[in-house]
């Protein structure tokens, strides 16, 4: 299976080349030239598999230059009991909906599913391509990706990683997870501005041919651990198939019937992975795209106009504080009939004017698949309180946004299709916001709050989060977006 580019259909490269490159030189994103087909019979066979086996099966359909034995070894290591516990992606029935818990990995966020596996895929891809260069991983993060990438790549031979996060734009726990990171090949810095400034800076570096050529002469090759990299996205497709198997095994859905999938959405990667699962054969009726107050995606799905020229809000769900949703480009490409010229036009307009309007046909195609809505901080807090009091389920603010939007979707449409809601982070990463939502005391240090939330909820604090209280911060700097390239050159290139 080869991969093409959202902005240039003439490109055709292998999976390992796409993973190594991360992004096309023209700024476009890689997608399979065609999607593998997964029959109900194939899904039925997955029902008795372990999670690592399910993941290896689905990922192997996309990464055809990797052997089945290779992928089984990688997923067994990445999703081991020591990293993810007994059940990496459990589905919890909370009465009315199912919750797909994606926060049981080393950094307590859904990004672990991709970023525990990506180092294996990336280093193996380099070997397959006969490349001995050092691979420098660049990451822009709104909170969770940074720590998950650092955890995945720390001290991996032949790699270095540099993470940029928006100053003041993450939770305190998210920030500490990054600034205390151990490893001889890691760099972290805050960037003045918001996530979009950091992400735009990383994209500009990738498409700066003079700079990337200079690095290649030094034996250094850039790659990405953001969801613009196909190697980040494909592991996420697997957990939607796994969730369906678990729902069928539990009797929550009759095997073969459709489900709805609701996802808290910022950069559009997680919900796009769900849509790709449907393209492959997963029985899905509707996708519910849930935004916070930065509701650029809600407005786009409703109107057909994407406009980032709007106020930027810092919310209690910081991983969704995004106005440029990079993975939306992949959806535009797929639903436009793989029209690369049309996508180039939209992306040029976004770069020039900060907005674009899709064709009526493309807008209809998007609206046919995706429902949408948003919940502000007040709505998310009310959902946290109500869900805990009525269902004894403790949700983090991102998950609460998805629950709130899904409940409103169900009320307004009467759609009673069995639903799964992606829970993307542990509530302990956002203890202050969760305690405030529950009407509890929020005084004291971040670790006082974690302890208090554990007492109130009866839940166990994830060990890696508990361990942060004894770790010293290593990375305390803050730079301007214009200085990102020099920061990389000074720090990562040794």
Listing of model-derived features with the role each one plays in the protein:
Residues 1-494:
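PLP-dependent amino-acid enzyme catalytic core
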